[in-house]
């Protein structure tokens, strides 16, 4: 049994490290320097940290470092927020945070506040909580030590994920209706990628809700299913972008709502002007 647990942790840990490495490349080395790539990197960072954190419950790590117990509990609420911002920035680009962007991180802030009483507990009390959770792995996802009814924290994360994926599908429908007459192969590929990205996330969230209420699986508990779900998303994103890195360049400017039509028309008009008129014309439009 111990050997299986070690292999489970090794798999989750390796996939989590891959997610962090891919996120680092997206954030620092992406030549397109696009806003959307930064959000995708932040999404990968978030789910990789959560995955590794859950994976460490298969080891004695938290017995040696009890003050790190649940330290990343609020990070799980950041992943859906970054996911929505990524989809939105790809389909409808923006260059600065607005009120909606800030509102998306409100659940993470609220849950971080809820976790504060746990964080300030004495080390001896934390060790008792950790030992009990490691003996009964079901308690890891139920979070009885948090100031909420058991399991509400996990449900809140999953429901928030479902709400976000529904919002992402709404964005996909809006973009599809908006550009129905102007699609080309590159933009269609990006659209398919965003659709698959959203679909995979939503399916995994729905499966976790079903498992939470009906306990259909007899082979692994809810915590293990969360681990493998997060690992599956990380692998899907990493492998897909490995074979299709051009998706990081996003949609063409004409499909991103960039107002370039007016400037193009002005440049065409300027071709037919004299040199003196061109100079005056340029001064007016600069």
Task: Please identify what each model-predicted range represents.
Residues 64-65, 135-154, 219-220:
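Membrane-interface segments at the starts/ends of alpha-helical transmembrane spans
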Residues 24, 78-105:
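Internal transmembrane alpha-helix with an interfacial aromatic "cap," most often the third helix
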Residues 62-74, 217-227:
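Non-cytosolic membrane-interface motifs at loop->transmembrane helix junctions
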Residues 54-63, 116-122, 206-218:
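Juxtamembrane "helix-exit" motif on the non-cytosolic side of transmembrane helices
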Residues 1-18, 153-158:
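Hydrophobic transmembrane alpha-helical segments in integral membrane proteins
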Residues 30-52, 105, 144-212, 224-233:
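Alpha-helical transmembrane segments of multi-pass integral membrane proteins
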Residues 239-286:
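Membrane-proximal linker segments that couple transmembrane helices to downstream signaling/catalytic modules
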Residues 92-121, 128-135, 151, 185-201:
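The cytoplasmic-loop to transmembrane-helix boundary for the fourth helix
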